Design a protein with these regions (language model features):
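Sec/Tat signal peptide C-region and signal peptidase I cleavage site
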Residues: 18-22
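Bacterial N-terminal signal peptides
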Residues: 8-16
Length: 369
């Protein structure tokens, strides 16, 4: 099965849970603007995906350098710099994380960068056990690369920087915990370089995305390529609601689980959420996805613009302390709003936008029919 079809099959399952209001309207309008497809594909690859992975690699490189500097000369200031570099990497990753198709899903690379959710805390226990054991082989990139995905991802590094016992990072030179963290950062740097290089290769994945053909390993025609881009938008929006919000809060503060929020230890939950939205917004705008709409459906684009903007501006105003945010009426009201708007966004992409270009939530993304 082609990588985009694995995404599409997953998309079919996620959008199936959304109330469908637009399926009966799929046939209205002129459908997909075929003439705009080549430019949209080129912009998606050259203006969004490739720069996104290069930015992630650049952030990971700076994070590795910051971790090594902290290990060599520990201080409160250097620890703060490492945490800042971690936050910048969360931001860069979150922006490109939405593109969960292509090289990123090969060789478990996605999980190498972010192992989440860890619902049963198995990954956390593995990280704690590794730090307690302090085996020197786990202080090298090669050693970390041979471990489970839970021990080499951003969540593992977050625990190193902000978990129990992290105060040692600011005082003890070349301590095991720090060197393990530097190895994790180095492994993430190496993984992101592989992905960026594969996207930058002229005869590689970028060619098959920009020029669909029967010989392509990704898309045989424009419809398949547009389906994949629609899949990124819909699946991204659904994932944001399911994994960035409902993982810890579903509308009832009594049953909230703040420590299930991604990056809660480092206070980067909303950094991640906002980055995900910015990633969707960048793909939507820079790839000019609205140009695929028929002329009588341009109001769909205006609605999606409004929803994206509201999500992007609301999230950064919420307390980064998730437990405190859920417990405060004003912040909780904002989270409730994010839940509502993110659901509208997923429906807007799948039903309204997808329907207007001839692909709706009822479209069989699994088989391309």
């Amino acid at each position: 099965m082609r990588p985009w079809k694995r995404l599409a099959a997953s998309l079919l399952l996620t959008v199936a849970a959304l109330p469908v209001h637009a399926e009966d309207k799929t046939a209205t309008g002129a459908g997909l603007n075929e003439a705009a497809v080549p430019a949209t594909l080129q912009k998606a690859v050259d203006d969004v995906i490739r720069p996104g992975y290069r930015a992630m690699h650049d952030s990971a490189s700076k994070l590795t350098a910051a971790m090594k500097a902290l290990c060599a000369d520990p201080s409160t200031a250097r620890l703060a710099s490492a945490k800042s570099a971690f936050g910048d990497t969360v931001k860069s990753w979150s922006r490109i994380e939405i593109v969960d198709t292509g090289p990123i899903i090969e060789k478990n690379r996605f999980e190498h960068i972010l192992f989440y959710p860890d619902r049963k805390g198995v990954g956390l226990k593995q990280v704690q056990a590794l730090i307690a054991k302090a085996d020197e082989q786990d202080t090298t990139v090669e050693g970390v690369a041979g471990k489970s995905v839970a021990l080499m991802s951003m969540t593992a590094l977050e625990y190193v920087l902000d978990g129990n016992g992290s105060e040692v990072l600011a005082t003890e030179k070349q301590n095991f915990r720090c060197r393990y963290g530097a190895a994790v950062a180095g492994n993430i740097e190496s993984t992101t370089k592989e992905i960026a290089d594969e996207w930058d290769a002229p005869e590689g994945v970028q060619k098959s995305w920009k020029f669909p053909s029967k010989d392509s390993s990704d898309f045989t025609d424009n419809k398949e390529a547009v389906t994949a881009l629609l899949g990124v938008l819909v699946h991204g929006a659904v994932k944001i609601r399911d994994q960035r919000l409902e993982s810890f809060y579903k509308g009832d503060p009594a049953s909230a689980r703040p420590k299930m929020a991604v990056y809660w230890r480092s206070g980067n939950t909303w950094t991640s959420f906002t980055g995900n939205i910015e990633g969707l917004k960048t793909l939507w705008e820079k790839a000019d996805m609205a140009s695929l709409l028929p002329s009588d459906k341009r109001d769909v684009a205006a609605k999606i613009d409004r929803l994206l903007n509201e999500l992007a501006t609301t999230a950064p105003t919420i307390n980064p302390d998730i437990e405190a945010a859920v417990g405060k009426d004003t912040d909780r009201a904002k989270i409730d709003r994010l839940l509502s708007v993110s659901r509208d966004l997923a429906k807007g992409f799948s039903d309204e936008y997808g329907g207007a270009i001839g692909l709706s939530a009822g479209f069989s993304f699994a088989d391309g029919d």
